[in-house]
Design a protein with these regions (language model features):
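Active-site-proximal beta-strand elements of phosphoester/diester hydrolases
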Residues: 215-219
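N-terminal beta1-alpha1 cap of cysteine-dependent amidohydrolase-like domains
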Residues: 1-111, 122, 129, 133-168, ...
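Glycine-rich beta-to-alpha active-site loop
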Residues: 112, 117
Length: 254
């Protein structure tokens, strides 16, 4: 059996259920994430954002995939909300911030996608642009919320050719999709920027030595770009699962 990869999930409210069920919500993880893990040889396990469970979940997984989703509450990086802030989910925010703390303490390999990169950055001490169009000072800001289907690329990113990301992707020029209005502002000190869009927006970050700590985050939705048109994005899942497998082996003999 492959390594167990925890995949974070979101909460969706169903008004029709609220009349008959106390919680009135259901947990959702997009299938693209779990299929991406499974195709890479991992065993995906969806992690519902239940208060008080983060530490126990961290103890049982070999890798963590932080999925995309809603905006992160800016109070986690010391700011008040701007008018352009979208919906936040307090339960999910609190759970994921605690979960990241516990998995990093244990050395669990972490892969963040879109919101996942943002959560990683904030958990490690960084900050975010709450809304790129209103806060990012660049005349050449490109559209980071595409209207095309998620599996279609909409802009290019340049990868640092000295980065481990370049080795994983086997390329320094990537075509990516874009579904976000928040982004990394001040990067957390342990991380390095390894990919940027043409407007300077951070598109990927990593821990400088992945053999020491496997921490990688990308701003694009790699889970939706694993088809034959963009096969290089599968490499991210493959590398993460491989790191999780090594973590599982070390844990077994500890």
């Amino acid at each position: 059996m492959g390594p167990i990869i925890g995949v974070t999930a979101t909460l969706k409210e169903d008004p029709q259920l609220m009349a008959t069920r106390p919680l009135g919500s259901f947990v959702r993880a997009d299938l693209d994430y779990v299929v991406g893990v499974a195709d890479a040889g991992g065993v995906p396990v969806v992690l519902p954002p239940i208060p008080g469970t983060a530490e126990k979940m961290a103890e049982r997984i070999d890798g963590l995939l932080l999925s995309g989703g809603s905006d992160l509450d800016p109070s986690y990086y010391g700011e008040k909300p701007v008018p352009e802030l979208d919906v936040t989910l307090p339960e999910r925010d609190a759970f994921e911030m605690a979960l990241v703390e516990h998995v990093l303490d244990r050395g669990v390999p972490v892969f963040g996608i879109c919101r996942g990169l943002q959560v990683l950055n904030v958990a490690l001490g960084g900050t975010l642009y709450q809304d790129l169009p209103s806060q990012y000072s660049s005349d050449g800001l490109i559209a980071h919320r595409q209207k095309m289907p998620k599996w279609q690329w909409t802009h290019e990113v340049e990868v640092d050719d000295n980065s481990e990301m370049a080795q994983i992707m086997d390329s320094v020029d990537l075509r990516v999709n874009s579904y976000h209005h928040q982004a990394v502002k001040n990067l957390a000190e342990p991380l390095s920027v390894v990919a940027q869009a043409c407007d300077g927006v951070v598109e990927a970050a990593e821990y400088p030595d992945l053999s020491e700590r496997w921490i990688v985050g990308v701003q694009w939705h790699a889970e939706a770009m694993r088809d034959t048109q963009s096969p290089e994005h599968r490499n991210l899942f493959t590398a993460h699962v491989a790191a999780a497998e090594q973590y599982a082996l070390r844990r077994a003999v500890a």
